[in-house]
Amino acid sequence: MKALYWHVVIATLVTFGFLLYIDFKLQAHWAILLFTSLVAVMWLFSFVYNRKSFFQVFFLMELLIFFTKEMFKASFQVAWEVISPKLSIEAGMIAVPLDVKKNLEITILASLISLTPGTLSVEISEDKSYLFVHAMYIPFGDVDKLKAEIKDGFERRVLRVFN
């Protein structure tokens, strides 16, 4: 029964792979077969050994894609600010309440915020419950909106990777 389960999962993923990438070259068929078989085996072993670590890879990829998108968006905003003749900077300091508790999680969150142009992690409170962030742009002085963007954007994804 267990062997049948493996074959069904691999056959299903290979079929979806062929349907997704309709290419009739022999090399493409071998590549699809190899890749989908590898994914199927990883998926099956994740249930046997550690299901959580398998999905953490996808959460990490999601975090990296989100960070890259935010970095490019902020870079263009800062670059536009530099070349435009009129300044529209609305800078300020905010205290973001933290849900992350471990030192590594806090460090990664603070680093991601600091690497995004226009924001800088300044300090962490002694009880590790607040992260103080200097932001170059606080839209219309709406501090709560910026806090929500940090919490729903970076912090939520960091928590998903580590929990």
Predicted regions and their residues:
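Contiguous hydrophobic segments
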Residues: 1-15, 52, 56, 83, ...
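Short, flexible segments with low predicted structural confidence
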Residues: 32, 50-51, 84-85, 129-130
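Flexible, solvent-exposed loop/hinge segments and secondary-structure transition points
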Residues: 61-103
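Terminal membrane-proximal soluble interaction domains of membrane-associated proteins
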Residues: 90-163
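Short helix-capping/hinge motifs at transmembrane helix termini and TM-loop junctions
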Residues: 22, 49, 84-85, 163
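Membrane-targeting alpha-helical segments
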Residues: 1-79
